[in-house]
A protein has these predicted regions:
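Catalytic cores of alpha/beta
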Residues: 2, 6-7, 12-28, 110-148
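Alpha-helix-loop-beta-strand connector modules within alpha/beta enzyme cores
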Residues: 1-7, 39-59, 104-131, 170-171
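C-terminal helical cap(s) of enzyme catalytic domains, especially alpha/beta-barrels
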Residues: 41-49, 139-171
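Active-site phosphate/pyrophosphate- and oxyanion-stabilizing loops and adjacent acidic/basic residues
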Residues: 43, 83, 113, 136, ...
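Conserved anion-binding
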Residues: 19-22, 26-101
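Structural motif corresponding to alpha-helix initiation and N-cap regions
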Residues: 15, 36-39, 75-79, 109, ...
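Short active-site-adjacent structural elements
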Residues: 102-104, 132-135, 154-157
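Glycine- and other small-residue-rich loops at beta-strand/loop junctions that grip anionic moieties
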Residues: 10-11, 31-34, 96, 101-104, ...
């Protein structure tokens, strides 16, 4: 038995789905497109299950939110979505610069700095992470976490080394 928190996102569009996930033991439901299309639902989720049970995924290209699996770009600034969701009761956010996701370039530090400030540090950063030094910089900037996929898959980041290094800096 492993004690691990599980966060699930993708296709969650109603209160029933959130309830079902939480009943199964999921720690947090990650809401994306629905946060743009039905902000009232996000507010209801926060009221019914508490703000710890939800995270909003802010997927952005050039500072504007993308929805529907990144297939549709909106005219909604990412910062405005965060503001609206904070008013709805959301505390934790994931920010992905989708133009960098999977590219092994580097994170969009300027956007992440803004998002960290706007979320009081309750931000998980994603997109473009390619090396351990970038994870350490994200921790220094105040991000509470990071999503690393491609860099672990390619071997550019050793997971055990990253966990050890980040634990030493409190990240």
């Amino acid at each position: 038995s492993v004690n691990v928190s599980v966060q699930v996102g993708g296709g969650i569009r109603d209160l029933y789905s959130v309830r079902r996930l939480l009943d199964l033991g999921v720690t947090r439901a990650m809401l994306g497109t629905v946060a743009v299309q039905d902000p009232e639902l996000v507010s209801r989720v926060c009221i019914e299950f508490g703000s710890d049970a939800v995270m909003v995924s802010v997927d952005a290209r050039d500072g504007f939110v993308s929805v529907s699996g990144w297939t549709s770009n909106s005219k909604l600034p990412a910062s405005q979505l965060v503001e609206t969701m904070r008013e709805a009761g959301v505390q934790t956010f994931q920010y992905t610069d989708i133009s960098r996701d999977g590219t092994l370039t580097e994170p969009n530090y300027s956007a992440i700095i803004e998002m960290v400030a706007q979320t009081d540090g309750h931000l998980i950063a994603a997109g473009g992470i390619s090396e351990l030094g970038q994870l350490l910089r994200l921790a220094e900037l105040g991000a509470s976490g990071a999503v690393v996929g491609t860099a672990i898959y390619t071997g550019d980041i050793d997971l055990a080394e990253a966990v050890d290094a980040l634990s030493q800096v409190g990240g």
